[in-house]
């Protein structure tokens, strides 16, 4: 059945434009509250958000929806997505909500839902919520005496700070490291610098002055130029860039070079394999991860299991096949020993542990393999299904035939934006550029003709 609201990472869109309106947010609260209203106990939801201007509006709407369904709402305020997942379990909530559009600009917002186990909801549960959204939910409203209460929870930052600190091995401190961190003017602007400082690092922070409209604006993991400049300016040993909700991370080494999620997963996998804590004899990544990562792991007797794009697919495969390391090239890294979803800060701490134990510079620690030339370009679309056009299908088939065993081709619609993503990789950079350019031209011509 076709999804009407939920994409690869919850419901997302431009604020105050359907579906990201307060009306729909309230209805999601009623629908989710109804579905998770099981048993006779007092039900509760935890609701977090990032620092977007629209977060206050959507937070209040969701509180109204959940309380109308008879669910008590525990309001957390601005806090990272992984903290919401952790607190959903810690506070014994029936459901968790994160109001965020992750790395998107402030105009966008979104709703992510977590079950009582801290994992994102299954497709089946999301479809049940969608079905209710289309119906009259008057019958599901609580009786007057059973309306839920709303409460702002204090001390949630401290709980997450302690959780994150516990993921660094007890024999490791960060003393002697100068760390520059970019919090993307987002949800981790308070907690991330505090964790690093409490573990002993000298911390230089940027992107920690959110004003509602500057989240991810020329900062954070999708725009690391400011961090590169800061690393050079203060001569930092490492730079850490989080995104708006802090579920992804990108590293900048002491030379200013960007280290992506593929390299970070390689570092963690190799380190955990050496101390025999890696499960599944490999890691889980998506079809977008570089072929160089796959070759690196194979050379060391480890496997790379690939999934569709989206950390929920990575997590699902990890759970089914008992892996404890997974993630995406974009910097979503899931370490199931420590959490149920991507956690940029916790992933960065594992890298810092390797840096401290080896005594080597970040540029040496984090350059684990030579990436195969890879090119990713996007085509913006306004509707339709250009990938189903016969001309586009033929161009894709021709490109796959040309690459054969010397590379890979991935073409897919974005699950969060109106884009077609075209990615190719292979040992011949010129060939890759030509193939991607040709496909972009064909898709664009079909889009313009529609």
Swiss-Prot record:
EC number: 5.4.2.10
Modified residues (Phosphoserine): 102
Comment on bound cofactor: Binds 1 Mg(2+) ion per subunit.
Lineage: superkingdom: Bacteria
Keywords attached to this entry: Isomerase, Magnesium, Metal-binding, Phosphoprotein
PTM comment, free text: Activated by phosphorylation.
Record GO biological process: carbohydrate metabolic process; peptidoglycan biosynthetic process; UDP-N-acetylglucosamine biosynthetic process
Active-site residues from the entry: 102
Recorded coiled-coil stretches: none
The UniProt record lists the keyword Nucleotidyltransferase: no
Protein name: Phosphoglucosamine mutase
Record organism: Rhizobium rhizogenes (strain K84 / ATCC BAA-868)
Taxonomy of the source species: Bacteria, Pseudomonadati, Pseudomonadota, Alphaproteobacteria, Hyphomicrobiales
């Amino acid at each position: 059945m076709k999804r009407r609201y939920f994409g690869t990472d919850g419901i997302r869109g431009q604020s105050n434009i359907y579906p990201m309106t307060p009306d729909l947010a309230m209805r999601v609260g009623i629908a989710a509250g109804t579905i998770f209203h099981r048993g006779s106990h007092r039900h509760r939801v935890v609701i977090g958000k990032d620092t977007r201007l629209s977060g206050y509006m959507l937070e209040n709407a969701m509180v109204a929806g959940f309380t109308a369904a008879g669910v008590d709402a525990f309001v957390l305020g601005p806090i990272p997505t992984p903290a919401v997942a952790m607190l959903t379990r810690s506070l014994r909530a029936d459901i968790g909500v994160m109001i965020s559009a992750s790395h998107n600009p402030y105009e966008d917002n979104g709703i992510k839902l977590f079950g009582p186990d801290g994992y994102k909801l299954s497709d089946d549960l999301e479809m049940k919520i969608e079905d209710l959204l289309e119906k009259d939910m008057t019958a599901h409203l609580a009786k007057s005496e059973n309306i839920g209460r709303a409460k702002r929870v204090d001390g949630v930052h401290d709980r997450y700070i302690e959780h994150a600190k516990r993921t660094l091995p007890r024999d490791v401190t960060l003393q002697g490291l100068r760390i520059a961190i970019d919090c993307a003017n987002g949800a981790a602007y308070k907690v991330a610098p505090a964790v690093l400082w409490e573990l002993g690092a000298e911390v230089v922070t940027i992107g920690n002055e959110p004003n509602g409209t500057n989240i991810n604006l020329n900062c954070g993991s999708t725009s690391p130029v400011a961090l590169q400049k800061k690393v050079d300016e203060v001569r930092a040993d490492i730079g850490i860039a989080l995104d708006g909700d802090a579920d992804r991370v990108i590293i900048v080494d002491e030379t200013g070079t960007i280290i992506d999620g593929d390299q970070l997963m390689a570092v963690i996998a190799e380190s955990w394999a050496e101390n025999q804590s890696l499960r599944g004899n490999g890691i889980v990544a998506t079809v977008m991860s570089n072929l160089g990562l796959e070759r690196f792991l194979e050379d060391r007797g480890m496997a790379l299991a690939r999934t569709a794009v989206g950390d929920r697919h990575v997590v699902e495969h990890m759970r089914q096949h008992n892996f404890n390391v997974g993630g995406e090239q974009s910097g979503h890294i899931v370490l199931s020993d420590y959490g149920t979803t991507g956690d940029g800060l916790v992933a960065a701490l594992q890298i810092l542990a390797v840096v401290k134990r080896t005594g080597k510079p970040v540029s040496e620690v984090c350059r684990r393999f030579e990436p195969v030339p890879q090119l990713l370009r996007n085509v913006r679309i306004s509707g339709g299904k250009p990938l189903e056009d016969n001309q586009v299908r033929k161009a894709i088939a021709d490109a796959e035939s040309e690459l054969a065993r010397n590379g890979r081709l991935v073409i897919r619609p974005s699950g969060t934006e109106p884009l077609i993503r075209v990615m190719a990789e292979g040992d011949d950079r010129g060939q890759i550029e030509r193939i991607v350019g040709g496909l972009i031209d064909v898709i664009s011509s079909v889009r313009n003709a529609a």
